[in-house]
Amino acid sequence: MTILKKIMLLGVGLIVLSCQQTKKATFLILPTPQQSTVGEQFSSIAPENLVMAYSPTKDALPNLFDFTKTLQETENESQAQVSFQINKELDLPEQGYFLDITDQRIIIEAKDDAGLFYGFVTLDQIAEDASLQGVNLPIAQIKDYPELSYRSIHWDVKHHLDKETYYYDLIDNMARQKINGVILEIEDKLKYQTHPEIGSADAFSSSQWLAISEYAMERHISISPLVQGLGHASFILKHPTYFELRDNPQSDWAFNPLNQKTYEVQFDLYDEALAITPHGKYLHVGGDEVKTTGRNSGQSALELQLYWLNKVAKYAQQQNRIPIFWDDMPLKEAALMDPIYNTSISNAEVDSIWNANEPKLNAFLDKFPKNCIYMRWNYHTPQTYGNQKAMEWFIKNDLQVMGATAGQTRWTLMPLRESNIDNIKTFAINSIKGNLSGLLLTLWDDDSPHFELYKRGIGAFAEYTWAGDKSTKEEYKSLFRHRTFGPQWKNENFAFIDSLEAPVGAWVNALVVDKSHRNSLKKNNNAKEQLLITLPNANQKGEWAERYAARLSNAKKHYEQTSTNAKKMEMLIEGGAKNEFMIEVYQQVLKLTHFSFETLLLLEQYDKATSEKEVQEAMENIMKQRTKFNLLRNELETVYAQTRILNKPENYILDQDHHRHPANQTINFDWQFYSELLFLDKIEEHFKNQSPFNEGQSKTKLELQ
């Protein structure tokens, strides 16, 4: 090679290096590392050149994702871009790791297998950011470990299953965020061999669930089962075979804890649930929201609950599992629940209540099993002094305690309250300060939003349980957009989830009379007349619009707001944002809310119409709503069905629905649209006598199931 050519090549190299060094790029990791220095300089390693990995200690590569998945092990150190090893002597907590990106080499050193896995997870996020922004990997030094050792997500499958492949996708998604546990509320979604009538016809087999458990464990996620025992037992007690085990013969809610056959059934179900979750550490036995009498035995509800708890705790111990028990009923029986949720009382008042009522708990202290974890669940007010007092009572009495926060409680259609980020963060920080071992994020299936809509809350849980108080709420939201949609979408200008909350919150009861709720419609045989709002009267023009003026004003505001949100979502999709399916699910949420507001505004137009032409046009537009809705429903179901099983089996037995769970009110997917379907029926019945009904319109009626 001539000197001139060498000089020219060197010049080109310097120009390329200069471009690399001056180009701006943003690297954000979820969860945020404990210590991180990501400089403005870039290495010589392009993300697509991550090809070979070398371990001086002969450790095996962990399971890898996306941009690190192409790595292959080599015994030739000089060939490797990545050097990795496990060093149990590292001065780091368990699951910790060091990640060092130099100009020519990436070095990962981990405390244990989990730490090695998490080190590569972080590298993968960095490589993805580099690829999306067209730069090499940055020069970086990271020291990282979790603040809470157990960071678990609740999978509640009681009212529906998702497609089997989706659970594998969810495991990958959680593992990428360093979540390491799942509590699987299995109910009737396992084909039980000992009690086959309990398993739903669409339940997964034991081999299917076992395969999911094994896949999760390979990604450092241990799955433990939750099988409700004392209360919330409708999935068992609705079947005639088990009527004799009911505490109240007329109710399918709770077992009789004094009937020894209760334990024969429960232990059979436990056996099978434990078999499909062999890597789990826990057996969650539930036990919340239940008050039994033992068929009028004369024993108190607290005595009976502790009798049951000791029986199941002993079983768990024999199976080498730690039982977890929802702690609300002992606190409620001792009149100590109000200070937990009452944010208006002073600390002194809380102390006074505890001084008066704590002896009621202490009287039963010797009956609280010591091998049990008492799960202090609080989804709305974890910051209260009363909540802390409750947790401290367990700790000072040498009882194990763990918290439970929520990413989904009883919100309809999608989680609200900014995905409950504030409460998730508060409980995580309090758990860290209290030196607790872990925290659970509950995701209740009662109202059954699509799981994609939980992911911002899951990300917040991952962030604050791992990193602690390192990001504000707004910083986390930006981090979520960065990691979920891509670095170019992290700016607040592209945020759309929060601005959906007000329309969704208003949509819930937009068509329902005041002081009622759409979840109660199915319980009322005359809901169409009694619980839905009235319709305009042709002989009393303007009266309807005046009566519902506030409702219509809100409908107009939210109609316009959803139109703005629709443009933002479309912009993200057209711009190539990642996770397009999540955006599509949010689009369906938006379209459903938009429809209800549009229907109200069309009714207002009819009520205010003065000329015959205006009246006729308004009625025609109203009558088109059924066809519009059918198209909307079909589109929503098509999107949701990509991952979700929409309908229950035809032979499924619906239970008594004690807590108004809409997802358990119909066999098919009608429950999701019950208010809209009923309202459309009411509209058609109301208007067909006022003007000739267009026979070309769909007359599909709500099929009550």
Model-derived features: positions:
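Feature activates predominantly on carbohydrate-active enzymes
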Residues: 90-96, 101-317, 324, 402-405, ...
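A short, charged/proline- and glycine-enriched loop
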Residues: 45-49, 146-151, 370
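Short, solvent-exposed amphipathic alpha-helical segments in soluble enzyme
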Residues: 66-71, 124-125, 170, 390-399
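Acidic, contiguous N-terminal accessory segments
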Residues: 19-114, 118, 122-142, 325-330, ...
